[in-house]
């Protein structure tokens, strides 16, 4: 199971946890994925994982 947006390809990023003493340990920033239903041209329905930022953009462009 890949944590990747089906439309934009947005995936995990790598960064650091930084403590108060400035110690750094690696961590991953995961995209905010949402499962949505999409109706294809042939009438079938599929579930895809889409980032929340992609959903906002799609909603903005549909108006």
Curated annotation (Swiss-Prot):
Disordered as annotated region, ranges: 1-20
Family annotation (InterPro entries): Bacterial_rp_bL28, Ribosomal_bL28, Ribosomal_bL28/bL31-like_sf, Ribosomal_bL28_bact-type, Ribosomal_bL28_sf
GO biological process: translation
Key word Ribosomal protein present: yes
Transmembrane annotation, as ranges: none
Alphabetical keyword list: Ribonucleoprotein, Ribosomal protein
Keyword Ribosomal protein: yes
GO molecular function: structural constituent of ribosome
GO cellular component annotations of the record: ribonucleoprotein complex; ribosome
Family according to the record: Belongs to the bacterial ribosomal protein bL28 family.
PANTHER family attached to this UniProt entry: 50S RIBOSOMAL PROTEIN L28, LARGE RIBOSOMAL SUBUNIT PROTEIN BL28A
HAMAP family: Ribosomal_bL28 (MF_00373)
Protein name: Large ribosomal subunit protein bL28
Native organism: Campylobacter curvus (strain 525.92)
The organism's taxonomic lineage, starting at the top: Bacteria, Pseudomonadati, Campylobacterota, Epsilonproteobacteria, Campylobacterales
